[in-house]
Amino acid sequence: MRLLVISGRSGSGKTSALHLLEDEGFTCIDNLPVKLLPALIEQIGDAPHASKHKFAIGIDARNLNSDLSQIESLIKDNLPANAECLVVYLDTSREVLLKRFSETRRKHPLSDQNTGLNEAIAKEKVILEPVAAAADITVDTSHMSLHELRSTIKRLVVGEESKGMAIMFKSFGFKYGVPVDADFIFDVRCLPNPYWSPELRSQSGLEAGVIEFLNSQQEVDDMFDDICAFVQKWAPSFQANNRSYLTVAIGCTGGMHRSVYLAERLAAELKKGYANVQTRHRQLEQKPGA
């Protein structure tokens, strides 16, 4: 039996994630009271051919605080030995949530006559802290389109069954904020910057000119060697601990040159030992026309 618990802040994409999982053959139950988890786990565990069943359960902040604080123990104490459970938490920045609710004009579940949108968002974050702490996977959807969210959930949650631990190398620009879903963050702003070469400024770390420039820098080789050695040393420990994913974020100033180049180079090296290695370039995806 495979059980996924999908939670997160309202507006972060929980419903969209459940719709995708339903398309992938999961039986989905949304807004389940946490205190009913043990009974549900027992019931689906006793069903015929239970080992082949796949369930996804949506849990939100409308549960009692005391119930949410017990979510980790409720799962651990009631899950059958032959079952697998993964808790996925979707997070989004306050600014993006305010924008999303303003644009859609949807009512926040915790807002009322006495609670405005800003206060409801802050209140929900506190209520869901026990779930966020218990999460096996945290996905920051602040900068994701619906298509990107579905692709990410499919890659990390649906696709990880047969491919083992997924290793994601994510490039980003520090000027746009640090990704909250990273397990490790490496700052490469100290490296020579192609941005200061006028002929390279408009290119990205995927293009030949930038690659040639960075390939010629000894500091870049040293940084690559050190990050690669770190990931290669510790990735087996994460995998042995039944982790389904490992996200390594590489950041430069604008997220266009150095971080992109290193993320691609690191992914190419790690693919020699791992079947499920991907890259994501946050700032490239946000360029006009991307």
UniProtKB/Swiss-Prot annotation:
Keywords, comma-separated and alphabetical: ATP-binding, GTP-binding, Nucleotide-binding
Classification via Pfam families: PapZ_C, RapZ-like_N
Gene3D superfamilies: P-loop containing nucleotide triphosphate hydrolases (3.40.50.300)
Positions with a binding annotation for GTP: D60, A61, R62, N63
Binding site for ATP: G8, R9, S10, G11, S12, G13, K14, T15
Domain of life (superkingdom): Bacteria
Gene Ontology molecular-function annotations: ATP binding; GTP binding
Function: Displays ATPase and GTPase activities.
Stated family: Belongs to the RapZ-like family.
NCBIfam families, sorted: PRK05416.1 (NF003828)
Protein name: Nucleotide-binding protein Sde_3181
Species the sequence originates in: Saccharophagus degradans (strain 2-40 / ATCC 43961 / DSM 17024)
Species classification: Bacteria, Pseudomonadati, Pseudomonadota, Gammaproteobacteria, Cellvibrionales
